[in-house]
């Protein structure tokens, strides 16, 4: 959202425009040469862009949809702006990775949803859109990259539909379409917490000093869900100077 990605497109000679509600970042991006509207992306803003600049051949939205409660509102905005032959590419946290890797700590207040292909495909179909390709990324533990176009006029990407079906089958095989899978996962997570607490307490009793490595937001999720306190961790280190010399939320480590 600081214009880094769009700069590459601009360097290739394309017209670019950013949209981000963080006014300080939008201002910085604009000053660096990437015009960025300090707005929330929605249908109204999308229609204004289409009116003033024309429809977009490419719309990118990387790791921002999870921060927005109204996913269908995003889709309405994309429909108002996307050219009939255009492609919308977005990245979101992939539930298959979150589940298979046990990344429950990435589920916190800023991440209101995680996605799988099967329900996304049905959602887009109801809006006259379709997924034409998918990919996976290791960013933030595992991300899903979707390529979406209009149902009737989307470009064809070689191997795209095969990739879509492959992930749909993988999701079903992992049991992600079954609620019982997540009840079992919850029990497994809680058991892991009990084992971790026992391990830390045992180390402390033997005279060990235990330090936390890294202070991301997900660390707070982990500490609260596993009830880790000052008695368990002496302190936490992080190379981000903005976090140094402070304490963790609530636990005050």
Question: Which residues make up each language-model segment?
Answer:
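A short glycine-rich, Lys/Arg-flanked "PGG" loop and its adjoining helix->strand segment in the class I
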Residues: 72-89
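Flexible, glycine-/basic-rich loop-and-beta segments that form/coincide
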Residues: 140-188
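Conserved S-adenosyl-L-methionine
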Residues: 129-140
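A solvent-exposed beta-alpha-beta segment
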Residues: 30-32, 201-253
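Short amphipathic alpha-helix with an adjacent loop that forms part of the alpha/beta core around
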Residues: 44-54
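Short, glycine-/aromatic-enriched active-site segment of Class I SAM-dependent methyltransferases
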Residues: 88-113, 117-120, 124
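A conserved beta-strand element that flanks and buttresses the S-adenosyl-L-methionine
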Residues: 57-60
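Class I SAM-dependent methyltransferase SAM/SAH-binding core
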Residues: 2-45, 231-246
């Amino acid at each position: 959202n600081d214009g880094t990605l769009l700069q590459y497109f601009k360097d290739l000679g394309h017209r670019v425009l950013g949209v981000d509600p963080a006014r300080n970042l939008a201002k910085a991006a604009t000053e660096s040469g990437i015009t960025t509207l300090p707005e929330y992306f929605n249908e109204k803003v999308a229609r204004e862009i289409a009116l003033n600049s024309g429809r977009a051949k490419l719309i990118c939205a990387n790791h921002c949809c999870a921060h927005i409660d109204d996913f269908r509102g995003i889709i309405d905005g994309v429909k108002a702006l996307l050219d009939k032959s255009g492609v919308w590419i977005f990245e979101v946290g992939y539930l298959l990775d979150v589940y298979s890797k046990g990344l429950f700590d990435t589920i916190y207040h800023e991440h209101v949803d995680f996605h799988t292909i099967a329900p996304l495909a049905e959602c887009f179909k109801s809006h006259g859109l379709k997924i034409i390709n998918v990919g996976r990324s290791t960013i933030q533990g595992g991300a899903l990259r979707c390529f979406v176009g209009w149902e009737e006029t989307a470009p064809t990407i070689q191997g795209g539909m095969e990739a879509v079906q492959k992930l749909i089958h993988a999701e079903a095989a992992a049991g992600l379409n079954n609620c019982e899978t997540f009840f079992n996962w919850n029990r497994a997570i809680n058991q892991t917490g009990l084992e971790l607490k026992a391990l830390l307490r045992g180390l402390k009793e033997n005279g060990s000093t235990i330090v936390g490595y890294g202070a991301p937001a997900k660390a707070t999720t982990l500490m609260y869900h596993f009830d880790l306190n000052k008695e368990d961790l002496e302190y936490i280190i992080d190379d981000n100077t903005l976090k140094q010399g402070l304490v963790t939320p609530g636990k005050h480590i």
